Regions:
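A short, Lys/Arg-rich alpha-helix, primarily the initiator
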Residues: 1-18
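Helix-turn-helix DNA-binding elements, focusing on the entry/boundary residues of the two helices
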Residues: 12, 23, 34, 49-52
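The alpha-helix within a helix-turn-helix
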Residues: 16, 27, 56
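Short alpha-helical DNA-recognition segment
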Residues: 20-39
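Short, conserved catalytic or interaction motifs in soluble domains
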Residues: 42
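DNA major-groove recognition helix of helix-turn-helix/homeodomain DNA-binding modules
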Residues: 48-65
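Interfacial/linker helices and their anchor residues that mediate assembly or domain coupling
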Residues: 68-108
Length: 108
């Protein structure tokens, strides 16, 4: 994922900077080691679900919003940014729209 910007990593870095905290401070508050946090922020590693949960709690942000960014990054890492990936995402969007409409009362 190093060739692409990590939206999740950038977001986490912005949260940390807004709070004027070091990686070490976040590490202590999340029990995730500093080198791993640095790699997540730089987009060199994907966070685990447990790490996302800890980061969401630490920063007091929605775990679901972190998981959305995480899922998008997993897709892009696996399939790259190209027309095929775009078309596949559009197809998934069409296929999932009825579910979203039923379960949340809104359409994508």
């Amino acid at each position: 994922m190093s060739s692409q910007k990590s939206e999740l990593g950038q977001y986490l870095r912005e949260l940390r900077k807004e709070r004027q905290e070091t990686l070490h401070q976040v590490s202590k508050g999340t029990d995730i080691d500093s080198p791993m946090l640095s790699k997540i922020e730089r987009g060199e590693r994907l966070a685990t679900n447990e790490q996302l949960k800890r980061l969401a709690a630490f920063y007091k942000v929605s775990e679901a919003s972190l998981k959305v960014k995480h899922t998008a990054e997993k897709i892009l890492k696996e399939y790259g940014i190209n027309e095929t990936t775009y078309d596949a995402i559009q197809l998934v969007n069409e296929q999932i729209a009825p579910y979203i409409t039923k379960s949340k009362g809104k359409k994508l």
